[in-house]
């Protein structure tokens, strides 16, 4: 073989000229020059393959090899007969060691190779090993198709069953093996170098080639054992990848729909991820049905953040199928990015490799010693570090080398120091630590274990613990590391344990073993549960311990039986202290927090003697209600802080007391006066009653119970059933009286009930009316429970302070009116003192509408004095000296069809101003609401074309304002809405202007700069236009009138309001509906007519009154009646509209208009008004013309149609002294081509003139003709001809005859022609021989003429004929070609 082939990587042991199994030396090859020096590889000349002449035990320790990355170093050393160890030095978190058995021996010389057999079926390899994470130990099994990763679960020996059993009972293989599967003969691994797993260091690994199920949980595909090329045990150290202590604290989906987030804690400081890294885990989640599912997944990393910190958050591809419960196993290994660590030296042991099973246990091997040579050798096994020394030495020795033998390790295996991270303050290299990790050990039994067992993220107990701790410290959720060291059903004292006689740790009790205790007082040593707990901690050092223990001990104390020694409280305390001492001996003087024991003996419930007391049992149930109808449930919690629980209140059906009608859940944090409470407000129970019985009947008798929800347990109380007592004094903290008439009472009636179908003052649903909104708003703003706020309806129909059907105060006797006296007993009977009195819109606003405004001041004086007297009486009589009256602002009333008119705005403003004045005087009155939107009719309900009472929406909006004002003491009188300052515009009027526009005007009040208007159709009410104006006028133009009414109008439906531009507030409106001012006192001109003059002018004439010669004239376009030609004042009874003005407006060249739309009215210059106008519409009267119209006007082509002169002809005038004006017009643009007076009866439009006018010859003409008086210049009416000129008929059939002499006569059919132009052509060269005009349809070509032309006599005749009519019309020439016949 050549050096080039060798450098290209070809097999140096095989010649390319022969079969690889038949090797030869290189002397037979022609070697090329290499750097001018010939180089040879001298190989042993074996000539032929040798047979396998000895045997080798499969998996012989001397024949294992190692492989690892360049940044670490390792070597393999066999010892004993079945063992080897691998000393290693680790330097990065990417260091990875593979300990391999190769199916094909490619490292030995051909004379010493072992046999290749890829079939491992039936073999079982058992051995002891010390991986850094025994539960995550894997082997890579290579096949020709792919490499598989197989997890090796640890096995422990069960002395009872005498079998090796998988220690991973949750995700293990579930297989067991007989005792002799593993036989220890060599030195075992030192215990100090074994990592504890599942509470023991005594375990082995079993590679069963008949059961190669992949997957962490052994639920993947099965590897085919018949074709394996390599077996490589995967070895790492604790710092590998993210680190041994890395764990998944939480997983949750991101909002992008394509990724989820993984929060990881306990990572190595220098660990980093890269996109494409794979993270494997076994985790649990809740599926869509709420069932827990386990999954084994490999997630691909998209990105991460938080390098070197506890905020290590990873974004991974994919979406989680359910809510994260927990992670049972996490593999953050084999990453793309390496990071430095503190140099670690360790030994990986593989001891007592035991091969069993039915598979082939021995392989054939060649062993052919060679002749001894007295020569040395430099190893050809470049980097032979991966082989055992025994293997290398034996082979070199067998090949005959005896002098010296040198092997070397390449430079790639010397230590390459990586950059480490250094502490800025201390200078310490940070290469071996994990990030900020705060391990908290949870130890004890079931009541602590439940934090890990119950629920799903983020609702598990330890989730809440983590969340609180991390929020407190301001670090990432994964920064706090809860460690589950608990074991359920365990006792702290061995004497109290379920099975104190067995020390085998068996938390499931599946094998009848025990080990469920924490301390053995007699032996003074830790129990299996404590050792298991410490094993869960591993090499971590907890910062604190949460301890919860006692259920099992308490049970043993209550039922000791024949236990010996007998359980006692003293022993339990002593054992607990021992546990604490042991833990502190390991972890230092760390704090231990005790989770309170919740346990009870068989004490019975005093409320229900047959119900035993349980921790958390609700007891001392009670219920009470207020007058509004709210219900409060109360109870006490036995032996449990209620804040730790939730409670479900179950209410029984009043029609079937065995059936639960409704339930709801409250938090146990709702506690007052030693009772846990739950409110059942009218807003809560009315919908329930509506669904159950169809009506909101109030509860009187009730049966209910409460169920404590604690740690996934339900602890029900005994039911409570009785009439619900009324207790306003105990429940209500604020009482709100609402008066004084329907504007206040509507808060309680169907007027504010959105579900009601009527609005007549009937009682509304309490959960829907605005009184509910009032008290809910008050409660929210005041920080009270809704049940503590009670509204009370004290309104009387049509009541005012001193006027109305009912009166609140009698001014004549200065004493309470009938409305106030009617509610006195009811208010006193509430059992609570009223805090507020809401005085809604008083009836004064209605009353003042119908009385003279001069009486208003006296009414307002009485209103104020009566209110003061009433407040003083209420405070004294009802026992609350701090009672306040809160005004619900005065509002107006609207009447009429939509849109209604505000006919009461001035009275309303007067009352409202008085309310504001009183509310700002600090005399016990305040203003709570101006009633939002009450300045607009849309806030009112339409009842029989009147808008008096508010809409449902307005009632609720008012209730919100009142509730907020009362709760927060907001006196809105100090900050009224803008619209309350606005007034209806005064002196609104409209005028019909001379332009036929309508102008609406009103007074401009000082300080007002904007107005909002609406113009509506007087018949339909539809809005024509609306908007904001900046001057006190509006013009309804004639054009807009025509658009809206198809003509002008005198009627208007117009409203206008003052408008606050900054806030958008709108004041009360003024309205105008009716006929605007117009000139009806004037008369309409008569005898209006329009006459067209001979010169084209149009004269309008009319007859007016002699005493009134002021007119307004309007001339309108006949093409668009909305376009005014002119509109102006006029002072005579005629007006001339010149033809020039007509032509200019309509874009005409001459003649002017023929139709008109003209109106004339009498006009009053003093006010700009006009009378009803007289109008003429249509064609103007035509003048009598003495001239005759031109007759016989037409045109003909004098040659080829479309390519010849055009002759225009007409009849000459019959009267002497006259000629004809002929205008030749452009057919398309109507521009004048020629204009001339002609005394003859024709005019020729030459071909040259056509081209000049059109750019081409004409195919049609447009001619206008008028008779013209030569002396006077008068013109007659226009006769117009627009057409294609006429042509003569084409020539018909032709004939050719000859006589005996040879003369040829040619003829043709006549048509309408009277003469013809004939051309005789030479038949041979088509030249014209003879041209002649004939008046008869025939021509003769004499024999001698023919002979002269041709030189011989021929009868072949060719001729063409063009026809001419008598008027000169012609057509195309027709050509004939025929032989003359006799």
Swiss-Prot record:
Primary site of residence: virion
Subunit structure and binding partners: Interacts with host NfrA receptor; this interaction is essential for viral adsorption to the host.
Keywords: Host-virus interaction, Viral attachment to host adhesion receptor, Viral attachment to host cell, Viral tail protein, Virion, Virus entry into host cell
Transcription keyword on record: no
A GO CC term assigned to this protein in UniProt: virus tail
Protein name: Non-contractile tail sheath
Taxonomic source organism: Enterobacteria phage N4 (Bacteriophage N4)
Leftover remarks: It is uncommon for short-tailed phages to have a tail tube inside a non-contractile sheath.
GO annotation, biological process: adhesion receptor-mediated virion attachment to host cell; symbiont entry into host cell
Pfam families: NCTSP_N (PF23844), TIM-barrel_NCTSP (PF23845)
Role: Assembles to form the non-contractile sheath that surrounds the tail tube. Allows viral attachment to the host by binding the bacterial outer membrane protein NfrA.
Compartment annotation: Virion
């Amino acid at each position: 073989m050549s050096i080039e082939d060798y450098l290209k990587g070809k097999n140096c042991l095989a010649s390319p000229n022969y079969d690889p199994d038949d090797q030869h030396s290189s002397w037979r090859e022609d070697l090329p020059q290499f750097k001018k020096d010939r180089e040879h590889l001298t190989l042993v000349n074996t000539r032929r393959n040798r047979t396998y002449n000895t045997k080798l035990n499969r998996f012989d320790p001397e024949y294992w090899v190692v492989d690892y990355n360049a940044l670490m170093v390792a070597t393999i050393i066999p010892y004993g007969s079945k063992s080897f160890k691998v000393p290693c030095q680790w330097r990065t978190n990417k260091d990875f060691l593979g300990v391999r058995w190769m199916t094909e021996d490619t490292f030995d010389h051909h004379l010493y190779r072992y046999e290749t057999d890829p079939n491992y079926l039936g073999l079982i390899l058992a051995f002891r090993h010390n991986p850094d994470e025994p539960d995550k130990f894997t082997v890579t099994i290579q096949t020709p198709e792919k490499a598989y990763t197989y997890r090796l679960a640890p096995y422990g020996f069960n002395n009872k069953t005498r079998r090796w059993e998988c220690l991973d009972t949750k995700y293990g293989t579930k297989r067991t093996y007989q005792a002799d599967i593993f036989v220890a003969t060599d030195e075992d691994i030192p215990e100090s170098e074994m990592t504890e797993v599942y509470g023991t260091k005594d375990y082995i690994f079993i590679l069963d080639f008949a059961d190669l199920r992949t997957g962490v949980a052994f639920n993947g595909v099965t590897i085919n054992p018949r074709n394996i090329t390599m077996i490589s045990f995967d070895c790492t150290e604790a710092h590998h990848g993210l680190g041994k202590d890395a764990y998944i604290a939480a997983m949750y989906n991101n909002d992008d729909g394509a990724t989820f987030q993984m929060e990881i804690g306990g990572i190595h400081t220098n660990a980093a991820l890269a996109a494409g890294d794979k993270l494997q885990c076994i985790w649990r989640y809740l599926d869509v049905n709420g069932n827990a599912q386990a999954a084994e997944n490999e997630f691909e990393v998209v990105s991460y953040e938080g390098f070197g910190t506890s905020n290590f958050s990873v974004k991974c591809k994919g979406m989680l199928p359910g809510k994260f419960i927990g992670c049972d196993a996490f593999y953050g290994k084999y990453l793309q990015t390496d990071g430095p660590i503190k140099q670690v030296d360790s030994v990986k042991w593989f001891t007592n490799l035991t091969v069993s099973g039915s598979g082939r246990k021995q392989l054939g091997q060649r062993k052919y010693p060679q002749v001894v040579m007295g020569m040395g050798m430099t190893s050809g096994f470049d980097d032979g570090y991966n082989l055992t020394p025994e293997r290398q030495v034996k082979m070199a020795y067998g090949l005959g080398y005896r002098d010296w033998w040198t092997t070397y390790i390449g430079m790639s295996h010397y230590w390459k120091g990586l950059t480490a991270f250094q502490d800025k303050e201390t200078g310490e290299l940070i290469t071996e630590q994990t990030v900020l990790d705060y391990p908290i050990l949870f130890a004890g039994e079931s009541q602590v274990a439940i934090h890990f067992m119950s629920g799903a993220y983020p609702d598990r107990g330890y989730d809440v613990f983590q969340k609180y701790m991390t929020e407190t410290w301001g670090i990432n959720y994964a920064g706090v590391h809860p460690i589950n060291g608990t074991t359920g059903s365990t006792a702290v004292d061995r004497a109290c344990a379920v099975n104190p006689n067995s020390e085998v740790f068996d938390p499931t009790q599946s094998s009848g073993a025990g080990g469920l205790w924490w301390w053995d007082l007699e032996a003074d040593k830790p129990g299996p549960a404590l050792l298991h707990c410490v094993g869960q901690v591993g090499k971590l050092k907890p910062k604190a311990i949460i301890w919860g223990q006692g259920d099992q001990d308490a049970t043993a104390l209550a039922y000791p039986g024949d236990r010996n020694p007998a359980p006692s409280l003293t022993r339990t305390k002593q054992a607990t202290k021992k546990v604490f001492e042991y833990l502190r001996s390991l972890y230092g003087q760390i704090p231990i927090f005790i989770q309170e024991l919740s346990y009870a003996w068989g004490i019975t419930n005093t409320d229900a003697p047959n119900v035993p007391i349980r921790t958390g049992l609700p007891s001392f149930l009670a219920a009470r209600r207020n007058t509004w109808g709210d219900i409060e449930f109360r109870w006490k919690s036995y032996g449990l802080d209620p804040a730790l629980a939730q409670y479900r209140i179950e209410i029984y059906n009043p029609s079937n007391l065995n059936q639960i009608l409704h339930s709801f859940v409250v938090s146990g944090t709702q506690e007052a006066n030693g009772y846990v409470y739950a409110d059942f407000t009218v807003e809560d129970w009315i919908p329930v009653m509506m669904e159950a019985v169809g009506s909101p009947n109030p509860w009187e008798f009730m049966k209910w119970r409460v169920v404590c929800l604690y740690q996934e347990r339900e602890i029900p109380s005994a039911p409570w059933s009785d009439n619900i007592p009324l207790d306003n004094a105990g429940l209500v903290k604020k009482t709100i009286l609402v008066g004084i008439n329907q504007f206040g009472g509507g808060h309680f009636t169907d007027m504010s009930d959105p579900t009601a179908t009527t609005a007549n003052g009937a009682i509304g649903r309490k959960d829907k009316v605005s009184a509910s909104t009032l008290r809910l708003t008050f409660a929210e703003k005041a920080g009270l429970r809704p049940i503590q706020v009670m509204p009370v309806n004290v309104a009387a129909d049509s009541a005012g302070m001193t006027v109305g059907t009912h009166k609140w105060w009698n001014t004549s006797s200065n004493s309470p009116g009938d409305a106030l006296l009617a509610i006195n007993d009811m208010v006193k009977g509430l059992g609570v003192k009223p805090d507020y009195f809401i005085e809604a819109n008083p009836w004064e606003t209605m009353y003042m509408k119908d009385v003279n405004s001069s009486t208003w001041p006296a009414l307002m004086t009485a209103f104020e004095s009566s209110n003061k007297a009433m407040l003083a009486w209420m405070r004294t009589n009802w026992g609350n000296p701090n009672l306040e009256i809160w005004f619900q602002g005065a509002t107006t009333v609207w009447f009429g069809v939509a849109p209604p008119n505000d006919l009461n705005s001035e009275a309303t403003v007067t009352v409202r101003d008085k309310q504001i004045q009183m509310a700002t005087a600090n005399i016990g009155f305040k203003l709570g609401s101006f009633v939002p939107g009450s300045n607009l009719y849309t806030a009112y309900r339409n009842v029989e074309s009147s808008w008096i009472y508010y809409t449902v929406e307005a009632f609720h909006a008012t209730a919100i304002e009142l509730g907020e004002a009362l709760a927060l003491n907001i006196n809105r009188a100090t900050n009224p809405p803008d619209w309350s300052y606005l007034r209806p515009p005064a002196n609104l009027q409209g005028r019909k202007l001379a332009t036929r526009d309508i102008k609406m005007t009103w007074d401009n009040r000082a300080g007002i700069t904007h107005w909002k208007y609406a113009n509506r159709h007087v018949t339909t009410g539809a809005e024509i236009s609306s908007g904001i104006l900046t001057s006190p006028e509006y013009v309804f133009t004639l054009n807009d009138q025509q658009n809206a009414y198809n003509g002008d109008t005198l009627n208007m439906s117009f409203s206008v309001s003052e408008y606050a531009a900054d806030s958008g507030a709108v004041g009360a409106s003024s309205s105008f509906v009716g006929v605007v001012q117009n000139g009806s006192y004037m008369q309409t001109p008569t005898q209006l007519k329009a006459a067209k003059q001979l010169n084209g002018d149009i004269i309008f004439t009319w007859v007016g009154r002699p005493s009134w010669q002021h007119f307004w004239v309007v001339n309108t376009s006949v093409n668009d009646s909305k376009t005014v030609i002119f509109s102006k004042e006029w002072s005579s009874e005629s007006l001339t509209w010149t033809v020039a003005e007509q032509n200019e407006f309509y874009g005409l060249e001459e003649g002017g208009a023929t139709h008109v739309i003209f109106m004339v009215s009498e006009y009053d210059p003093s006010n700009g008004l006009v009378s009803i106008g007289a109008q003429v519409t249509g064609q103007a009267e035509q003048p009598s013309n003495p001239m005759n119209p031109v007759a016989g006007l037409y045109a003909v082509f004098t040659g080829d149609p479309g390519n010849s002169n055009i002759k225009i002809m007409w009849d000459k005038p019959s009267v002497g002294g006259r000629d004809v004006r002929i205008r030749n017009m452009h057919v398309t643009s109507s521009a004048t081509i020629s204009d001339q007076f002609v005394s003859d009866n024709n005019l020729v439009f030459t071909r040259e003139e056509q081209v000049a006018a059109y750019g081409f010859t004409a195919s049609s003409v447009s001619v206008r003709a008028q008779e013209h008086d030569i002396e006077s210049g008068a013109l007659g009416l226009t006769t117009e001809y627009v057409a294609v000129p006429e042509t003569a008929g084409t020539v018909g059939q032709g004939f050719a005859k000859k006589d005996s002499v040879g003369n040829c006569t040619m003829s043709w059919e006549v048509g309408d022609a009277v003469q013809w132009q004939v051309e005789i052509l030479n038949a041979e060269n088509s030249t014209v021989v003879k041209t002649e005009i004939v008046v008869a349809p025939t021509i003769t070509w004499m024999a001698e003429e023919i002979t002269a032309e041709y030189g011989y006599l021929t009868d072949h005749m060719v001729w063409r004929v063009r026809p001419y009519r008598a008027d000169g019309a012609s057509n195309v020439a027709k050509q004939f070609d025929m032989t003359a016949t006799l």
